[in-house]
């Protein structure tokens, strides 16, 4: 899977590598990338192995995610084995040696190389309670030593039918994170999350509480997780403050009826109250809103608004409009091979240039 990112309008923004630091950040630098290239081996229905550059998403993507809302996905050069020994039970193990981040290879922090990353996860559907997942994520990242950590946790998610078309929803999670590998700091910090909710017809309402603990010097972090999806769309808390973070939020999703022949539109409203987990500091509040409307097959327009009102952390923030698409274009096998060969050549050339060497080592790809 290859991807090409380019701008259509003026370069009046900071893409993190163009040097325009006086402009707002839009972290989508132009580039041509080999986004995914992997081989799958499935000797039996219950066992699957994937080797190569791949997108990895676990559970709600809090800890491991491909950041696919950005123009450039986050992928791992990894080996992953998935086993389903019996119905309702799954076991996963992954080993990754390279992280290809959403910032792109031209960014100083766009690629984390020579890592020692272990991903362990097991889940079981325990009807009628729900799905229980245990996990252990061990990150040793020499290029970003403060992101090296080991996180062990337990997650429960489920739903119960109520009268009519109503459902009770619930999720709860606990994890402990400690220093690991090249991290020079010593710490042990907890993560807690509770999210009860109710779904009635086309309306789903959730009230959640999430805590990422901090001790005043260091805080729990999620370097490979979905940063944008949590703690507000204004992205003020992609890095947890040293005093930690408590996020109390309300999340309402509504599937809209068909209008003028347009089906599948939806809207979402969120409210957040952010506080430190240590002490009584109030960081601020945030309103988020989204309207998503399918235009044609494979193309959706999303109007997204985020308003963060600062009390003692960050500054006020507003955001705007984006389009998302998932086009499926029929092409011939010869065209597929031509496109693949061209993409591989361009990406290998970029890889060599990013290393400032004259030869490419396949073992590093």
Enumerate the language-model features and the residues they cover.
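Cationic, low-complexity basic patches in intrinsically disordered or flexible, solvent-exposed regions
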Residues: 350, 354
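Surface-exposed loop and membrane-interface regions of Gram-negative outer-membrane beta-barrel proteins
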Residues: 1-38, 43-45, 56-70, 104-106, ...
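Flexible internal linker/loop segments at domain or repeat junctions
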Residues: 219-244
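C-terminal functional modules
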Residues: 244, 276-283, 290-311, 320-331
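Signature for the C-terminal beta-barrel architecture of outer-membrane proteins
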Residues: 45-49, 67-217, 248-250, 255, ...
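Extracellular/periplasm-exposed beta-strand and loop segments of Gram-negative cell-envelope proteins
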Residues: 13-15, 23-29, 158-160, 174, ...
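Outer-membrane beta-barrel "beta-signal"
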Residues: 250, 315-348, 358-361, 365
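Outer-membrane beta-barrel biogenesis signature
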Residues: 241-246, 253-265, 328-337
